[in-house]
Each structure stands twice: as C-alpha cells, then as structure tokens.
C-alpha cells in the first residue's frame, strides 16, 4: 500500500498508508521517526471478512478498549509498541515489522478448538493455559502452525531471524499477557476465556507486543457464563444480522470499554520500613527503591525497640488503625530487637532485613534468626529480597503487584535467553 494523504490527527501529520486491514489503517508519521499511527474503522468483520458490516462508533470504542488494555500492560512492564492514544479513533505506536503469526491462549476449550480436537468437552479447563499459533494467511484461513514450522520459516524482520529463542520469548510473553488480563478481569467478576495477540520487531531488534487488543481479540464471559458473552462471538454466531443485532453488539463493546476504564490497580497497601537508627537510612532507601519499582507504597520511620519500645509499639498501632494491607520491614543491626518486638505485637507480616556487614554477618544476623517460639517474622539479607518478599505477599490481593513480579521474572528470562544466544557456539582450541 503506497497511497498518501495530507491529513493530520491531533497535530500528527499523516504520511503514506503503510498497510490497510479490514478494520484499521496504519499511517507513517513523517515528522515522528520511528512512530506510526493506527486508525480504527467503523467496521466489524468475521470469517476472514466473509461477514462484514459497518458499525457506527466501533472505531472509537475499539480505540478506547485498546488504550485501556495497553495502559494495564504498560504499567505492568510488558514491552509493547503502544505509545499513547491520539484522538478518538487512533493511537500512536512504535513502528515495527510484524511477525505473521497469531498467538492464541485459551483457559477454557470452546470455539474452533472443539472442532479441531473432537472429543474434548466444551469448558475443559487448561492449566496452564493452552497456547496455539496460526500463520496469518487470509486466503488459506490462517492455518494452524506448529512451533517447528515457525522456526523453519526463518522469518527475518528488522535484521532479526525468528528462531527457537524468539519463539520461546513470544510464548512466555503471550502467556503472561493473558494471565495479567485474566487477573484484571477477575476484579470485575469476568472470565477471560481466550485471546489472540501479535508481535512485531522494532528498529532496535527487540520483540514487542503490537497491533490492537480489543473486543475482537478475546472471549469474555461475565460471571464465567457463556450465555452472557460480551465479545465478538455474539456477532459471529448471527446467521442473519439486523440493525438491532448490531446495536446489541455495540452495547456489549461499550460495556467492555467502560469496565476496563474502571479497572484501576488498588493502592490500599503500605510497606512500613522501620529502622532502628537513622544510620540505617542507606540500607532502608535501597529497600524502598526496590519496593517502589514493584508498585508498592512505602513509608520510612525510625524507632528503636531497645531504647524506646513504647514509641515503637505506638507507631505500629498508628498504621494498624488506618491500613488493612500492611507489611513491616525491620532494619536493625547488631542485636535485632526491632523485628521480633514488632512481630510479637502485630498480626501483620514482619520481614527482618538487617544491614549486616561481611565482617560481622554471622554474629549480627543470629538475633534475627534465633527467635523465641510464637514469632513468625521472616529474615532476608538483601534489600531487593525484602521488597520481593513484601510484593509476593501483597500480590496475593493486588493483580498489578502480582503482574510486576511476573514481568520481572519474564525480563530475567529474556535477558538470559539473549545472553545465551550471543555466547552460544562451539569454540575450538
């Protein structure tokens, strides 16, 4: 596609149409190198475009839905091409070359999976979620491909050849994207049944989640009830399509967009870092920095359980009275009375993270480990470990904290994959 336009959207001058699909156009942005603009259409299709109808307002709804989805994924730390919304019907994205593979993740067996896997009952639950890949080819109805076929195709995009390492990265990322959105929708008592995503390769050679994620991309069942579905399957199931039917589909899509806008990660938690002395500030700040990187709210206080036990307990009661999701991190060297005293006085989790040094570690850490019976505080040595432990606890009730932890693990996996790929190979003497 090489048509050009002189139009602009929200001050962004549109260049040539890079590609046009059934429901969107992708424009070059000549004044914004490395970026492009995706403009949605008021169009709904199914069956590789065999069924298609105009649907006034769909472009705006789709764009809003997509923006809310990528808001959550970007906040979690997933690497995406999405930059920002641009007007009612468009958004700005990093320019990338798309990998022609559609990644599908399924929590429950339904739809085309049942036709391809005769004998599997509808509603069969996949744990972990089932993953499938399809080669994007409308003429052949997007045939299912194996992992071996993807690797053997040797797609080369922006200088990167898609091999086993890249497939592994996309597979892990796809699964995590599904699980993040699944947990987000659980806060609205909605079950994410399955969804599809695509990836692209940016100019820097990195794999990013790309394209659009909207109500065309998933199956969504409120209260886990298929009869209440609010996704494009409602349109797919129509033998004949009336204006009233299209209005129902549109109302469903609006409902989805409104629910997504209301999914806001909770901030009803606090990690209180209690240090026995102001001299422990450096160690405590490292804990706080790690906590904030995981989306945790933090406060730092100074109180000595040895020199001022009454004040220590007053501080504990102060936070207990205003916060239900609360964790105390005790930072005290030498004889650590702070953590055990707090642990014996509260039902909230207490994590000891003493600022020990290599020359006195075995002596000083013992007071945090050899505790009287009835105390359940944990002990870690490193600031990041204290933050990770706190996040693991709070993530049980906060999907965004849980998501940030999982993304951190994913990024570790990707870093190791890339390092191994770079160093791999036989070295002769």
Swiss-Prot record:
Q: Which domain of life is it from?
A: Eukaryota
* Pfam families tied to this protein: AIRC (PF00731), SAICAR_synt (PF01259)
What are the entry keywords?
ATP-binding, Decarboxylase, Ligase, Lyase, Multifunctional enzyme, Nucleotide-binding, Purine biosynthesis
E.C. code? 6.3.2.6, 4.1.1.21
Please list the residues that bind CO2: 335
The record's CDD domains line, in alphabetical order, gives: SAICAR_synt_Ade5 (cd01416)
Q: Where is this region: SAICAR synthetase domain?
A: 7-264
Question: From the record, what ranges are coiled-coil?
Answer: none
| Annotated signal peptide | none
The segments labelled AIR carboxylase domain in the record are 270-429
Annotated region (SAICAR synthetase) at 7-264
Q: Which reaction does it catalyse?
A: 5-amino-1-(5-phospho-D-ribosyl)imidazole-4-carboxylate + L-aspartate + ATP = (2S)-2-[5-amino-1-(5-phospho-beta-D-ribosyl)imidazole-4-carboxamido]succinate + ADP + phosphate + 2 H(+); 5-amino-1-(5-phospho-D-ribosyl)imidazole-4-carboxylate + H(+) = 5-amino-1-(5-phospho-beta-D-ribosyl)imidazole + CO2
List the pathway annotation.
Purine metabolism; IMP biosynthesis via de novo pathway; 5-amino-1-(5-phospho-D-ribosyl)imidazole-4-carboxamide from 5-amino-1-(5-phospho-D-ribosyl)imidazole-4-carboxylate: step 1/2; Purine metabolism; IMP biosynthesis via de novo pathway; 5-amino-1-(5-phospho-D-ribosyl)imidazole-4-carboxylate from 5-amino-1-(5-phospho-D-ribosyl)imidazole (carboxylase route): step 1/1
Q: Where is this region: AIR carboxylase?
A: 265-429
Annotated Gene Ontology cellular component terms: cytoplasm; cytosol
Q: How does it assemble?
A: Homooctamer.
The similarity annotation says:
In the N-terminal section; belongs to the SAICAR synthetase family. In the C-terminal section; belongs to the AIR carboxylase family. Class II subfamily.
Q: What is this protein called?
A: Bifunctional phosphoribosylaminoimidazole carboxylase/phosphoribosylaminoimidazole succinocarboxamide synthetase
Q: Which organism is it from?
A: Drosophila melanogaster
